[in-house]
């Protein structure tokens, strides 16, 4: 069990797939709960066509006797990230399996996480790549190998961003009014403020 029951929320945008997965795997083994948002914006280094050829090769792997036994090929970005993390965990042991249960990866930002702060992992950032290095996003790869909800997620994200921008503008106005109210009240409460500060409070 981790030191806190609260989940670590990470925004997947502009993170490298393998590097972020290794950080998340370590946190899971330490007992933390991890939530990864916007999995479709996670980045894979290298040319897109090379990444697609590698994934198409993976899609051809199956059980000859009965393909329903596996291998199971996930198309959704969240599931691709989940499987990447699974490969970094001892998931066939009880410890690894329990750790994997604490991982959630979502496309877009679900409603319950829209008002929570998300973290960024600098060591897994896309900007660690060389400036001329090519890269592609997992969302595009998923779309081209069979994921059908790219447009749906894009529409929901556009709505969320408009709503978030309106909320931010309203918050700026309220903060400005609060600062002005403190300035207006300062002369009236000056004598009381001196008493409070004399007692050791700010």
From Swiss-Prot:
Superkingdom per UniProt: Eukaryota
Keywords assigned by UniProt, alphabetized: Ribonucleoprotein, Ribosomal protein
HAMAP family, A to Z: Ribosomal_uL13
One Gene Ontology term of the molecular function aspect: structural constituent of ribosome
Protein name, as recorded: Large ribosomal subunit protein uL13
Family to which this protein belongs: Belongs to the universal ribosomal protein uL13 family.
Family annotation (SUPFAM superfamilies): Ribosomal protein L13
One record GO biological process: negative regulation of translation
Keyword Protease: no
One GO cellular component term noted in the UniProt record for this chain: cytosolic large ribosomal subunit
